């Protein structure tokens, strides 16, 4: 738990000091590698509300800076059952006024490019997003679903 708290604290420090970015990626990346005693992915016992006091300032800062939040489909690939960040965090992002998202897949191999993008799109629509963003010359361009 302390490692997770430190992870979020450092992330907020980072985006407070360095603002020359377009998309904040890997918001809850640390959960991809947390396992329970049986070796199961940690995402199943990660509750947004448990870390809301650390996550909300990050989301608010992303919105304040008019940056995008990456939704990464690798969570599906690694058995978490959800993308990163998880749906509760994405709901909160919307509630706080966040609209800009990008979609990534950690496609370090050709077969992982755009991994489960259709599944992710369905989830994002269900949550209330109507599209995602790409960047061209660092300028955001909205792509509607």
Residue ranges and their predicted role:
Residues 1-64:
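Extended substrate/RNA-proximal surfaces in nucleic-acid metabolism proteins
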Residues 22-24, 66-70, 100-102, 131:
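Structural preference for beta-strand elements that scaffold enzyme active sites
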Residues 26, 69, 93, 106:
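Conserved, mostly hydrophobic/aromatic
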Residues 27, 98-114, 134-137:
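Short acidic/histidine-rich active-site segments
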Residues 28-33, 73-77, 107-109, 138:
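Active-site-proximal loop/turn and secondary-structure-junction residues that shape catalytic pockets
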Residues 33-39, 79-90, 110-122, 143-145:
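Histidine/acidic-residue-rich catalytic or RNA/ligand-binding cores of hydrolases
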Residues 63, 94-95, 125:
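Anion (oxyanion) recognition and catalysis
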Residues 118, 125-135, 139-145:
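C-terminal regulatory/interaction regions
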């Amino acid at each position: 738990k302390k490692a997770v708290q430190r992870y979020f604290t450092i992330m907020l420090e980072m985006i407070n000091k360095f603002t020359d970015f377009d998309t904040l990626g890997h918001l809850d990346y640390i959960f991809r590698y947390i396992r329970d005693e049986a070796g199961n992915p940690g995402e199943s016992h990660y509750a947004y509300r448990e870390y809301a006091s650390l996550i909300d300032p990050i989301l608010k800062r992303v919105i304040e800076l008019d940056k995008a939040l990456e939704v990464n489909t690798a969570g599906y690939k690694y058995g978490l059952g959800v993308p990163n960040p998880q749906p509760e965090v994405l709901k909160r992002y919307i509630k706080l006024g966040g609209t800009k998202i990008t979609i990534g897949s950690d496609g370090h191999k050709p077969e992982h490019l755009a991994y489960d993008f259709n599944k992710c799109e369905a989830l994002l629509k269900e949550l209330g997003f109507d599209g995602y963003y790409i960047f061209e010359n660092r300028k955001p361009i909205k792509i509607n679903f």
